[in-house]
């Protein structure tokens, strides 16, 4: 198999004629920071953790997508590499089993890439695009091997089911909920923060991240145990969504002015709260940062209650709750460093 460096070099050849890559300076010289660096987040009591195989898995997964995804230009290749999708997955799931982390990296990477495609589509076209991918993911329909999004998803889900059918199938429906939320017309009419957070729980893919974490860690819970985690997961979804929105706002605001009026429509907690409260964008971000730290405190309180409860708390449940904490702290670390937002 070619090394990642060899793959990048070979990919660059078809694009050397493109104006935007001729004599272009290194990436670090072309990146213009979008985020307001004068806004300092309040201190957190948490620390992030990254999966120990991050470098190895990132090279493997990035190499796979460089060979199979149809990037339109070498600039798009550099943007993809700068986003570090496998790194965020390893930050989301640092406790994943060594032989499962690559599955999670592949799934989140292809979903990020599909999200970028949808940004340039109408809701109707995006819905049709996703509806084609859903039965392929289930294994009910064979993929068109000329379309990377189809065969990548098909092969990935088949390999996940071969590894652990029960837990892989538990990830399916949450993935579809996430995909449907991407083209939900409700995002055009959200003007209240509470309504937004309810919608965003689907759009941020919280159920997907939770199910994928259980798959990656090999955790099995009864229906009652899963139900008992709902409040913790809902709280986690709010924190994840808002941290993501704070860091991605400037990039998404820019995209809303240049992209498709529906696919790139700006739907963000920053925008919603700014309009609702009549605060400026920097002030709104500061308010939202305070809210994220309060949700972290709520998480710690719920965890402490569960551990101290008379019914006790299994080691699997403790690992899962710690995993949710790492999702939040890992998401913040990635969001403030990825070139996707900065």
UniProtKB/Swiss-Prot annotation:
Record pathway: Sesquiterpene biosynthesis; aristolochene biosynthesis; aristolochene from farnesyl diphosphate: step 1/1
Keyword annotations from UniProtKB, A to Z: Lyase, Magnesium, Metal-binding
Name of protein: Aristolochene synthase prx2
Quaternary structure annotation from Swiss-Prot or TrEMBL: Homodimer.
Induction comment: Expression and the subsequent production of PR-toxin take place under static culture conditions (oxygen limited), whereas no expression of the PR-toxin genes occurs under the strongly aerated conditions required for optimal penicillin production. There is a negative control of the transcription of the PR-toxin genes by the penicillin biosynthesis gene product(s), or by a regulatory peptide encoded by a small ORF inside the penicillin gene cluster.
Residues at which Mg(2+) 1 binds: 115
Residues binding Mg(2+) 2, per UniProt: 115
A Pfam match: Terpene_syn_C_2
Domain of life: Eukaryota
Family of this protein: Belongs to the terpene synthase family.
GO biological processes: isoprenoid biosynthetic process
Protein EC: 4.2.3.9
Entries under InterPro entries matching the protein: Isoprenoid_synthase_dom_sf, Terpene_cyclase-like_2
Spans traversing the lipid bilayer: none
Keyword Magnesium belongs to the record: yes
Enzyme superclass (EC): lyase
Summary of the function given for this chain in its UniProt record: Aristolochene synthase; part of the gene cluster that mediates the biosynthesis of PR-toxin, a bicyclic sesquiterpene belonging to the eremophilane class and acting as a mycotoxin. The first step of the pathway is catalyzed by the aristolochene synthase which performs the cyclization of trans,trans-farnesyl diphosphate (FPP) to the bicyclic sesquiterpene aristolochene. Following the formation of aristolochene, the non-oxygenated aristolochene is converted to the trioxygenated intermediate eremofortin B, via 7-epi-neopetasone.
Binding site for (2E,6E)-farnesyl diphosphate: 340-341
Positions annotated to bind Mg(2+) 3: 244, 248, 252
One example GO MF annotation: aristolochene synthase activity
Cofactor note: Binds 3 Mg(2+) ions per subunit.
Site (Important for catalytic activity) location in chain: 92, 112, 178, 334
Catalysis performed (reactions): (2E,6E)-farnesyl diphosphate = (+)-aristolochene + diphosphate
Cofactor: Mg(2+)
């Amino acid at each position: 198999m070619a090394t990642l460096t060899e793959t990048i070099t070979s990919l660059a050849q078809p694009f050397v004629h493109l104006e935007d890559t001729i004599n272009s300076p290194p990436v670090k010289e072309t990146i213009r920071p979008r985020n307001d660096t004068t806004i300092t987040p309040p201190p957190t009591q948490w620390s992030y953790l990254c999966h120990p195989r991050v470098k190895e898995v990132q090279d493997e997964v990035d190499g796979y997508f460089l060979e199979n995804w149809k990037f339109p230009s070498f600039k798009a290749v550099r943007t993809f590499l700068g986003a570090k999708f496998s790194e965020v997955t390893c930050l989301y799931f640092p406790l994943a089993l060594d032989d499962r982390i690559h599955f999670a990296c592949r799934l989140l990477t292809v979903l990020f890439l599909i999200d970028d495609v949808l940004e340039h589509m109408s809701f109707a076209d995006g819905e049709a695009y996703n509806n084609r991918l859903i039965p392929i993911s289930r294994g009910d329909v064979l993929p068109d091997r000329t379309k990377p999004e189809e065969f990548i998803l098909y092969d990935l889900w088949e390999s996940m089911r071969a590894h652990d059918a029960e837990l892989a199938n538990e990830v399916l429906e949450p993935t579809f909920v996430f995909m449907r939320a991407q083209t939900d017309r409700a995002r055009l009419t959200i003007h209240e923060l509470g309504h937004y957070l309810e919608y965003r729980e689907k759009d941020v893919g919280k159920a997907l991240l939770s199910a994928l974490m259980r798959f990656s860690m090999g955790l099995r819970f009864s229906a009652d145990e899963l139900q008992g985690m709902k409040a913790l997961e809902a709280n986690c979804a709010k924190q994840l969504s808002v941290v993501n929105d704070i860091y991605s706002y400037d990039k998404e605001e820019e995209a809303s002015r240049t992209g498709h009026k529906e696919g790139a429509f700006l739907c963000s907690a920053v925008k919603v709260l700014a309009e609702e409260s009549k605060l400026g964008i920097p002030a709104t971000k500061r308010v939202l940062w305070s809210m994220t730290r309060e949700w972290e405190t709520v998480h710690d309180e719920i965890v402490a209650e569960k551990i101290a409860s008379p019914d006790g708390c299994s080691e699997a449940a403790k690992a899962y709750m710690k995993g949710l904490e790492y999702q939040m702290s890992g998401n913040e670390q990635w969001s403030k460093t990825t070139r996707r937002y900065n």
